[in-house]
Each structure stands twice: as C-alpha cells, then as structure tokens.
C-alpha cells in the first residue's frame, strides 16, 4: 500500500474535530470537515470560526466544511472519526459506501458503546467487517481542544498495529506545538481515553464538596489503578496507562478547568441534579455515558472498581456524593498493590 497521505477527512465538527482539522489545514494538508449542524456549517463557511464548539479560533483557509458525508469523504487518504461514542456506529454505517481509497480510519472518539460495551475499534470491526481493507488507529492524550486551537504545546499517543502507517500519520499530524507518540496498544489507548472521564466526574464531585487537594490526589491515583486493572483484564498493556493516554489524560481531565466531565462532577458535588446539568449544555460530557459502560464492564470481567461503582451510583441511582466518599474511605483495608512480596 502507498503510504502517502495528501488529504484528510474529519467526521465531526465538535471542538476536538475542528481543532484537529485546523491543525492539519494550517500545516498545509487539505482537510474536508463534515459538519452535522446547519448553523455551525454556515458559521465555518461564512466567518471561518466554529463559534459553537471552538470559539475564538480563526480557521485556516485549507479547511473546507461539508454537510454531505459523501462530499466530505471525497479523496480521503485518512478518515478521522471525531463524533460522540453514542452516534459512532450510526455515522460509520452511513460512511460505509465511501471508504474506497481510505488507507486509515483514525478514531479520535473517547468513549465506550453502552449497549454492546465495545470500544470503537470493535464497533468498526462489526460495522465494516471485511469490506474495509485499510488500517485502524486511535488517538488520545491530554489535549483540550481549545488549547490545541490556540497552538499551546500538546502531546498525544497514536495507537496503530502497523508501524510504517503509524509513522506516516505521525509525520502528518505532528507540528512544532503538537507532538505525536506511537503505540501498538489500541485497546489500552482507547480505554485510557474513555475511562478517565469517569474518574474525572468523581474528582469534580470531590472538588465540589470542598474536600481539598489530598482527596483529589488520592482519587486520581486510585482511579488510575482501576483503569489499569480493567484495561489489563480487557487485553491492554499495563504500561500504556503510565503514559499520555493513561495518567496524562487522567490528570488533565481531573484537574483542568476546561474539563466538561470534571465540571459535571463539581456541579453534582455542589448539589445540582444530573438532568439539570445535561439539559443546559451543547457540549458532550462523555463520562456520563461511559460510567454506565464501565460499571457493566467491571461486572462482566469481575474487576474491582470501587470508585467507578460509586460514580455510577451517584449518576444513575441518585446517591449522595458525601455518602459515596464515606463508603470509599471506610471500605475494607487493603495493601496498595494487592499483595506483599515474598521478601522485604
């Protein structure tokens, strides 16, 4: 296969999809961006700004918006999926006729499908099957879309099984402010990007309750242990979670003021109801949906996930966040790593 990448299509014009599209277009790569909302499409076309999802960022002339999926996919060497996880399958079904010539499908979605408990690579396998002959990759890491749009230094992980194709994509996406590292652990990178959103809701709730820095640090650290346990049970490499797609993305999402998931948690910690919060935002807090999937995955694989379980009870059973913290703190006492070495 010829690995040259001359055109990229990005499916989804939320903040992340628009930021990636603008990054590539500013570097000189022609980009076609699929925009679902008519109003957003007209904004980008007429004002060169996505005021709804990436306000204040002037978009490069090399970025072309389209409302037709067929037009957006025309001539693409790489197709980037940047849609929320709950619509990923449906959009991919609509894209099936337009994959001729696409060398790599790159998933920028951070989530898990609730009905099937599949990560996006598995959804791709089920939807496209043997009809798609190209590669699959995913990208994750500590990367707020607004900061990428402002050209602030950012580093992410790109996971793909074929190193040569990975290096070709790495070259296309990397700039003086956006650094891409390669990995071969697709499962780990996908799960790190998805599960950190659940922990971020918990971290936000702790902040909203006013429990301080000690509590937040403990929750992040023990949350990473849960992400790693579940990831390894699902076939991921444990060291992936010590990298950008693991602890990097987790720390950012649990501490950054731009984190939608942390914001949801903070508001719940301050006494607001989830339905009130979600009804007043156009941005997607993926962690709300991912919490349900993560809870079910813990049951399916028999993995102990106390923090994720408590976030689930807060969101879906209406549990008082203070009671959830109390129950976490008064659980049976344990060793940190689960066992003692034979000699010490």
Language-model regions, residue ranges each:
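NAD(P)+-binding Rossmann beta1-loop-alpha1 motif at the extreme N-terminus of oxidoreductases
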Residues: 1-57, 64-67, 94
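Structural beta-sheet core signal
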Residues: 10, 33, 105-107, 138, ...
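Rossmann-like NAD(P)(H) cofactor-binding subdomain of soluble oxidoreductases
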Residues: 59, 65-74, 78-153, 169
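NAD(P)-dependent Rossmann-like dehydrogenase/reductase catalytic/cofactor-binding core
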Residues: 203-207, 232-242, 250-344
């Amino acid at each position: 296969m010829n690995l040259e990448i001359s055109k990229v299509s990005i499916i989804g014009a939320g903040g992340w999809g628009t930021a990636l599209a603008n990054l590539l277009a500013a570097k000189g790569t022609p980009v076609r961006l699929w925009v679902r909302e008519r109003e957003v499409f007209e904004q980008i076309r007429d004002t060169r700004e996505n005021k709804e999802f990436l306000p204040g960022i002037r978009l490069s002339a090399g970025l072309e918006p389209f409302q037709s999926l067929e037009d957006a996919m025309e001539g693409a060497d790489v197709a980037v999926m940047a849609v929320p996880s709950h619509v990923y399958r449906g959009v991919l079904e609509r894209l099936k006729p337009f994959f001729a010539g696409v060398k790599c499908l790159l998933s920028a979605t951070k989530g898990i499908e609730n009905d099937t408990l599949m990560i996006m690579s598995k959804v791709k396998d089920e939807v496209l099957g043997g009809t798609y002959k190209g590669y699959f990759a995913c990208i994750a890491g500590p990367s707020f879309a607004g900061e990428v749009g402002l050209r602030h230094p950012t580093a992410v992980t790109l996971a793909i099984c074929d190193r040569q194709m990975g290096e070709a994509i790495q070259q296309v996406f990397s700039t003086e402010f956006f650094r891409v590292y390669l990995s071969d652990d697709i499962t780990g990178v996908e799960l790190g990007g998805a599960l950190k959103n659940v922990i971020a809701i918990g971290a936000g709730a702790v902040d909203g309750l006013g429990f301080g820095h000690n509590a937040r640090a403990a929750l992040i650290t023990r949350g990473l242990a849960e992400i790693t346990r579940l990831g390894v049970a699902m076939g991921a490499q444990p060291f992936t979670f010590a990298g950008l797609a693991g602890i990097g993305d987790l720390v950012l999402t649990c501490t950054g003021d731009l984190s939608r998931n942390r914001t949801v948690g903070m508001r719940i910690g301050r006494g607001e109801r989830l339905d009130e919060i979600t009804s007043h935002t156009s941005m997607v807090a993926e962690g709300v949906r991912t919490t349900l999937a993560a809870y079910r995955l813990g049951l399916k694989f028999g993995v102990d996930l106390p923090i994720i379980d408590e976030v689930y009870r807060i969101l879906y059973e209406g549990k008082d966040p203070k009671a959830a913290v109390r129950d976490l703190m008064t659980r049976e006492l344990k060793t940190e790593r689960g066992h003692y070495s034979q000699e010490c």
